UniProtKB/Swiss-Prot annotation:
Membrane-traversing stretches: 33-55
GO cellular component annotations of the record: mitochondrial inner membrane
Regions of this protein lying in the Mitochondrial intermembrane compartment: 56-86
Membrane topology: Single-pass membrane protein
Homology family: Belongs to the COA3 family.
Residues exposed to the Mitochondrial matrix side: 1-32
Taxonomic superkingdom: Eukaryota
Subcellular locations according to the entry: Mitochondrion inner membrane
InterPro entries assigned to the protein according to its UniProt record, in alphabetical order: Coa3
General function of this protein: Required for assembly of cytochrome c oxidase (complex IV).
Gene: COA3
Protein name from the UniProt record: Cytochrome c oxidase assembly factor 3, mitochondrial
Keywords: Membrane, Mitochondrion, Mitochondrion inner membrane, Transmembrane, Transmembrane helix
Subunit structure: Component of 250-400 kDa complexes called cytochrome oxidase assembly intermediates or COA complexes.
Source organism: Clavispora lusitaniae (strain ATCC 42720)
Amino acid sequence: MAVIGAPKGHNRYRDPKTFQMTPALYRVRKPFFWKNFAGFFLVSSIPLGVYLYTWNVLSKDEFADIPIPPISDEELAKLKKEYESK
């Protein structure tokens, strides 16, 4: 029975010595380039939109309404000493 196709271990879309793309692989991939690019654009725009929306919402947040508890001078000196020792 005759074997149809490339011999076992031979890849007709890659050069066997350099493993670079052959003109056949360029021809095979050409019709799918713009469809793949559009799909990539749509899929990547979703997380990018979520990220930009989150950044926009969080940048408007003000913390002026959160009261800062008073700290005693002894506690402040203790924290400074701890910070400077690191």
